[in-house]
Regions:
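Acidic (Asp/Glu) and glycine-rich low-complexity loops/linkers
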Residues: 2-73, 77-150, 156-168, 179-188, ...
């Protein structure tokens, strides 16, 4: 048992408090910087950049020659689905300098925005990001390759058909539905949930740092899943005996439960 010496001191009289000049000064400086920054933001080009980093857009290009799809978005929410008129459509809140073009069979979509905020004197602390919220519709065709890269945010991909696919995101949720991929479907995410529903693939290769992984569908190839923290659930429509004759399952989870279920 440790012995501590505690010296009780009896204080008499009244102790004079020192005026907190430093603390008050820092508050004044902080307020001045906040107000000054707001004035600067509201009266310079930075105002236009912060408030108009994203704009409402409705655009389209011909998709008849598209064989490969390459989409890059650094933050925000992106939905990718199927169009019904053979064109590529994009709509939503999108950076002013967005890229939407097809060249030599490759569709290039780039949506990049930087941090920004809006300053409102009536609501001083209503800070807002220039977040992207975009919908992209692709022709009803089978693409040689489909790739989408996102920095942070949500990515949803529905009703697509391709030979190979790669979905990458730094942090955020990935949702894939009604997806056909002849070869391996690759999904890489630093942190966030990965959910694949009603898919047919030639294999799956998922790598996630933290988050849950859920897959439901048919896999005609190897399964390779690496997750640091989180649960992993694979529900296959394949027959277990037939699958194990042809393919292998390699699942590595640092912390969390893993289960692989087959068609009964």
């Amino acid at each position: 048992m440790n012995n501590f010496n505690i010296n009780d001191k009896e204080f008499t009289g009244t102790k004079k408090r020192i005026f907190p000049y430093f603390s008050v000064g820092m508050v004044i400086v902080g307020a001045a910087m906040l107000i000054g920054g707001g004035i600067w933001t509201a009266t310079t080009d930075m105002s236009r950049y912060a408030k108009n980093g994203v704009i409402d857009v409705v655009d389209a290009v011909d998709g008849g020659n598209v064989e490969k799809v390459d989409i890059v978005v650094n933050t925000g929410t992106v939905y990718v689905g199927r169009s019904d008129d053979g064109q590529v459509h994009i709509e939503g809140k999108i950076p002013k300098d967005y890229v939407l073009k097809e060249k030599n069979g490759t569709l290039k979509v780039e949506l990049r925005t930087s941090f920004g905020f809006s300053f409102d004197w009536q609501d001083l602390f209503d800070w807002k990001y220039n977040e992207i919220d975009a919908k992209i519709y692709l022709p009803d065709a089978k693409f040689e390759s489909f790739e989408i890269s996102g920095g942070a945010g949500e990515i949803t991909v529905d009703d697509l058909n391709c030979v190979e696919a790669h979905i990458k995101t730094g942090a955020g949720e990935v949702s894939v539905n009604n997806f056909n991929c002849d070869k391996v479907l690759k999904i890489d995410t630093g942190a966030g949930d990965v959910k694949v529903n009603n898919a047919v693939t030639g294999g799956i290769d998922f790598d996630t740092g933290a988050g849950e992984v859920d897959f439901y569908g048919e896999v005609n190839g190897d399964i390779d899943i690496d997750t640091g923290v989180g649960e992993c659930t694979i529900n296959l429509t394949n027959d277990k005996a037939e699958f194990e004759k042809k393919y292998k399952v390699d699942i590595d989870t640092g912390v969390g439960e893993t289960s692989v279920n087959y068609n009964q």
